[in-house]
Amino acid sequence: IAIQGGXGYLXQPGDGYKYA
C-alpha cells in the first residue's frame, strides 16, 4: 500500500511516499 511519507523506504527515493 502506497502512503504519504517523508523519506525513502524499501529502496525507494525520498519522493514523499512510503510503501508498507
Swiss-Prot record:
It is found in: Secreted. One of its GO terms (molecular function) is lysozyme activity. Optimum pH is 8.0. GO terms for cellular component: extracellular region. Its EC number is 3.2.1.17. It catalyses: Hydrolysis of (1->4)-beta-linkages between N-acetylmuramic acid and N-acetyl-D-glucosamine residues in a peptidoglycan and between N-acetyl-D-glucosamine residues in chitodextrins. Optimum temperature is 60 degrees Celsius. Its main location: secreted. It comes from the Bacteria. The keyword Ribosomal protein does not apply. Keywords: Antibiotic, Antimicrobial, Bacteriolytic enzyme, Glycosidase, Hydrolase, Secreted. One of its GO terms (biological process) is defense response to bacterium. Has bacteriolytic activity. Monomer. This is Lysozyme.
